[in-house]
Amino acid sequence: TGRYYGGGSTPVPEARMTDGVLHTVLVKNVSKARFATLFGSYSAGDYKKLPQGIIRVSTAKVVRIEALEGDLTTCLDGESMHSQCVTLKLADKKVNFFAPKGCDPDATAR
């Protein structure tokens, strides 16, 4: 949850659950072999060390992704969906979490 996904990948370590923005990572169209060589740095959050122009990180309240042709396959919490466009919108504090007193939602889980 938060800034981690996929078994501990943290591509944008500065992301926080409470910062009010979606942190998006756009990986330029690279081959699977090329991405495999970059994945360690990407997963560790060292995107600033990657070659210029391969990855773009930005923040937004709304992200809309449209397929140039065909459908996109989107996976959300293990469920796959197919559509021509996907819109992600940040909901402002719509979920309440209960945690032990003094627990910081932005603290590192590691």
Task: Give the positions of each predicted feature.
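Long C-terminal subdomains/extensions of small-metabolite kinases
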Residues: 1-110
